[in-house]
């Protein structure tokens, strides 16, 4: 046996006698610990994610609840109806006061609540009933009054006034806000032309009588519409039909009162000479009563109901009184004119009396 064989034999014997260690349980323990750690981490992660999901769901629910509760409040807050008296600021002097009234009323709506018909359907103000009815009728009344001015001017119609009245037409396809801004610019140009003597505004007795008679026709129209709404025996509290009818009529009264008040202020000397100052004041008070009507809730109950209150019927009564009041002014003006025509002027009669020596 050589040396190499001996070495190999020794190595094989030593290898066979070396102890064999089973490390499988160690590996299993490590693997188990890893699995446990991973499982715990996974569970913690899942718990955290679940908590996040619940928190997010709760936040969404809270936001939704806040929105549901806040939306009605936003709807109520959006009801910004400005029915205060029209007052001209110091920024501009209006040579034609009626044009100033129209421009001021338009600007108040645009600068205040904005034009509701231009709002998106989801907007809180789009859910309102009274304010859209008010604005729709306000625009219609301004358009009617603008057309009246054009009729009074006849062949002297100003192109800027024609443009403004056309822009007030509700049948126009352009956005209402854009049309009203353009109309106000046209009104301002027309008023500048009146101030410069290039064109004129309707004044005098004939123009005043025409305004009074036309306003009486408007009052009769509104009376008929309100009477038709209030004829049923019973009605819902704050029904949409009743609300729209009352606030549309209210807008007509507001515009008519403001326009007649502006004319009366400009023509106060003429009214005094005609002896109708007090009668005109009564007519303005009648229109103002209709314009100021603003109950907390609109009711349209028949006489057989518990309250028996019908705001459309009450408004109709105000319009009938306004109609009679303006017709009385017109009749007195016409009577004064006829008396003036039939009676010789004062100074001329004095001269005749002095010449004959029979002064009276």
Predicted regions and their residues:
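N-terminal Sec/ER secretory leader and immediately downstream segment
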Residues: 83-182
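Short, charged/polar, low-complexity loop and linker segments
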Residues: 115-127, 196-199, 228-241, 299-307
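Juxtamembrane low-complexity tails/linkers enriched in Ser/Thr-Pro and polybasic
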Residues: 40-53
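Hydrophobic membrane-insertion alpha-helices, especially the h-region
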Residues: 59-75
